[in-house]
């Protein structure tokens, strides 16, 4: 059985890693970042849900009466 030649594996793996790094750098460099990021003012009091103001009862399926 012939021996597996692994002499080119190092070059192949290193060139693949280098190519991936270059591709990722190019993708990141094309991304548009905002110039002046500002904080959004979030008011939680403006959005009230009906279940926050009143008590609701949750029925489990097994606690309901049997239907035949």
Swiss-Prot record:
Residues with PTM N6-acetyllysine: 54, 57
Transmembrane segments: 8-24
Gene Ontology terms, MF aspect: proton transmembrane transporter activity
Keywords: Acetylation, ATP synthesis, CF(0), Hydrogen ion transport, Ion transport, Membrane, Mitochondrion, Transmembrane, Transmembrane helix, Transport
Record text on subunit structure and interactions: Component of the ATP synthase complex composed at least of ATP5F1A/subunit alpha, ATP5F1B/subunit beta, ATP5MC1/subunit c (homooctomer), MT-ATP6/subunit a, MT-ATP8/subunit 8, ATP5ME/subunit e, ATP5MF/subunit f, ATP5MG/subunit g, ATP5MK/subunit k, ATP5MJ/subunit j, ATP5F1C/subunit gamma, ATP5F1D/subunit delta, ATP5F1E/subunit epsilon, ATP5PF/subunit F6, ATP5PB/subunit b, ATP5PD/subunit d, ATP5PO/subunit OSCP.
Biological function: Subunit 8, of the mitochondrial membrane ATP synthase complex (F(1)F(0) ATP synthase or Complex V) that produces ATP from ADP in the presence of a proton gradient across the membrane which is generated by electron transport complexes of the respiratory chain. ATP synthase complex consist of a soluble F(1) head domain - the catalytic core - and a membrane F(1) domain - the membrane proton channel. These two domains are linked by a central stalk rotating inside the F(1) region and a stationary peripheral stalk.
Family label: Belongs to the ATPase protein 8 family.
Protein name per the record: ATP synthase F(0) complex subunit 8
Organism: Lemur catta (Ring-tailed lemur)
Lineage, broadest ranks: Eukaryota, Metazoa, Chordata, Craniata, Vertebrata
């Amino acid at each position: 059985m012939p021996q597996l030649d692994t002499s080119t594996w190092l070059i192949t793996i290193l060139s693949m890693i280098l190519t991936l790094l270059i591709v990722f750098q190019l993708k990141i460099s094309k991304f548009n970042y905002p110039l002046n990021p500002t904080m959004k003012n979030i008011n939680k009091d403006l959005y009230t849900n009906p279940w926050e103001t009143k008590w609701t009862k949750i029925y489990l399926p097994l606690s309901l009466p049997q239907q035949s």
